[in-house]
Amino acid sequence: SNLSEINQYYEKNIPDADAWLDETETALENMKTILSDIRTQCTYGASDQLKAEDRKTILTQLESLRKQIYSEGNSDYAGRTVFTGYRTNCKLTFMEDESNTEYNIQQKFSYEDIGEHRYYDGQVELKTAEEMSQKVTTSDTKQYTYDRIRLAYGDIGSLKDKDGNEIAVGKTGTLSYHYTDNTGAAKTGDLNVTVYETEDDWKKAVKAGNMPKDGAAFIKSTGELVLGNKASETLKQNKASIELNYDKKGFNSGEVRPEYYFNCTDITDAKNKITYEKYDANGNEIYQDIDYIIAVNQTLTVNTNASDVF
């Protein structure tokens, strides 16, 4: 019996584990090369000598490279995908456009996810050299600088308030954020959020003076939570966390599937909803380690989860 176990380790488990790790390493090396290519393109795109057509070509190349990165996430060993945890029979990304697929997603953020972004208004895009040679009348270009939190997706169907109710476009609802005070006590604060359909709609509100310093704006088309200056400062000072609960219908080919990153529910079929848990009730990640027994009382974890790579 002991000899048969040793043979199993030597002839089957160890070669399988080695092949799985080798496939993962190959995919990661490919991604490293692609990221290097992306950096090269970005550096080249910063040149002042480039024309508009050149930059559009670079943008097309960057979009292609982005797709290549996520296609590596679908790498498999013997037909089993290596970055998808226990769901080795499933792809990491959507393989085709799925306009009717709908998810409810709970995406958690910390204060460290807040980043500064500049928004511009009154821009004019000159498409050709002929247009550039002509006199073009423009409105004054304005710049707005705000901190923001970006969702994993754009084209959001609806954002939920702290009670799980949809915040309608043009309306203001309340989200909750959580932090620990100086005594170690858990605290909860409120953040008022107004929902806008597009970035242009939000810019109109900003120009009208309707962007409160202690509030936020949510832009559905881009999936951005834009923070007022005071609101951002409060979240940072308290080292707060915030969870955004939203629905999204329609996913493009190449987009990552939400279940590998977030707690979410596939609500495409209202009568047969499918719930996925990435984190437990305490916010701890639920790991899906695939272990091979390679010797007596020795196991080796062979898989890497997509959320640790992408």
Residue ranges and their predicted role:
Residues 52-55, 68-83, 107-129, 251-256:
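Short secondary-structure capping/junction motifs at helix and strand boundaries
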Residues 101-148, 165:
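Polar, glycine-rich mid-to-C-terminal structural blocks
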Residues 1-97:
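Amphipathic alpha-helical polymerization modules
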Residues 1, 96-117, 217-310:
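Polar, low-complexity export/assembly segments characteristic of proteins
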Residues 44-54, 107-121, 154-170, 179, ...:
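Short flexible/disordered coil segments
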Residues 141-252, 257:
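Extended, beta-strand-rich, solvent-exposed assembly scaffolds of outer structural proteins
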